[in-house]
Amino acid sequence: MQGTKKALFVGGLLLAVVSSGVQAEALQPDPAWQQGKLDNGFTWQLLTTPQRPGDRVELRLVVNAGSLLENAQQVGFAHFLPRLALAPGDKLSAAQRPSMWTRDANSSRVLPPVVVSYDFTSYNLSLPNNRPELLKEALTWLSESAGQMAFDEKSLQAALKVPDQVATFPVNPQDPSWRYRLKGSPLLAHDPAQDVKPPLNGEQLQQFYKTWYTPDAMTLYIVGHVDNRSVIEQIGKVFSPLEGKREAPAPLPTLSPLPPQAISLMNNNVQQDTLSLMWDAPWHPIRESQALVRYWLGDMTREAMFWHLQQALEKSSLKSNNLRFDCNVFYTRSQCAIHMDVPNSEAVEPGVTFMARELATLREKGLTQQEFDALIARKTDELNKLFATYARTSTDILMDQRLRSQQNGVVDIAPEQYQKLRQTYLSALTLDMLNQELHQQLAQDTTLMLIQQPGEPEANMKALQETYDQIMTPTAEPVASAAAAAPEEKKPQETAPVAQ
């Protein structure tokens, strides 16, 4: 119980220190992002980037409609509608298409023209800079796709004959680890990659389109060096005629908590095994400074934990293994994981033993003052380069960041407010605070997952779990204390946002 109370006190102390410096202010949206709403409910967001005059102009029309809306007679409709929009016809000539989607030759990123998921469809365009006439054509095409598609037999057949260019999120909804993550969720029965099955009923498809493709469920995002006054005027001109209104709200996608039981999954598309330690928790929006501080504290702690493991791995006999770390938010759940790539199943147990020993030591001893000082120095250096980094951030990255913030309920703040809050936070943070957060995070339930390559015998996950638990279990006295504190240890987790 004492450890839990101390963690709560230290976390509260940091919040108090930071909040006193910034007066616990609400996060103010970055005014550089202009926003508007038309009379029909259509919304738009625009970021002009004079600091990036040579970048392409990025457009995303996000419709809050995906495969989760389909019933048994409508399977594949959400995926087929973009195919219909992309089919060559009077509205989109073959000459226009390359300019709207082809990136520069030196770009490594591939932009799919449309992405369909469970709860959204995103129409994506990337235009050459300084081509205002092409921007007008792009806005017109987006408007026509959003509310003026034709459903005659000729159009339907043309769409069926064109190769499917529509991507999905996630990229592979049939990935074994993703399917396992969806267990207990209605999403499992609504694959966004599912295409329509013949015969295609045009009337049913059109009704689905009119029901869910309504202007009050659409947002247009634009990032680039454009004439904002002209663009805003054009948006009103081409999107105001859209009609319709949602008569019923769309169902919200949800995920169940990740089961703590160890699991092994076979994946035919991998050539090595991957051992993962996964932490799953609720995600909470970030709209005020205290929530942002909680997020930063958890995020820096996870980063410190990963770099500690990385340095230990480089000094061990397992240094040929690759170590990765990621955090993602999926439908109000946050999932962070440490992944170790190993050549085969025989290397799994040494990997489990290594990670458990290092994490157990880190939980009990914490970071050293030297490690903490290095972390603060690195973060301070990043903060000092904030405006230079922002000036170098390309329009496609700025767009991705905006969409992620919108999806996760995070208020995008101006660089000036970010710098002020971040500096106050870094100045208030101490080694003891970070180590208490580290101890708390490593006391949470962890799911052990193993992705195996085809042809291998299935790993004994029960034995691997026992190996992990034996190392991670504290000595007798802390066990009793942890057992007494168990009901309260989850409380800080419920209130602390975690990494995106």
Predicted regions and their residues:
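N-terminal signal peptide c-region/cleavage motif recognized by signal peptidases
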Residues: 16-21
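C-terminal regions of mature proteins
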Residues: 25-26, 219-224, 376, 380-500
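Histidine-acidic residue clusters that define the catalytic metal-binding segment
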Residues: 25-34, 170, 177-218, 252-254, ...
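Acidic/histidine-enriched segments that form metal/cofactor-coordinating
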Residues: 98-208, 277, 353-357, 367-399
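An aromatic/glycine/proline-enriched structural segment found at the starts
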Residues: 219-276, 280-284, 455-456, 462-490
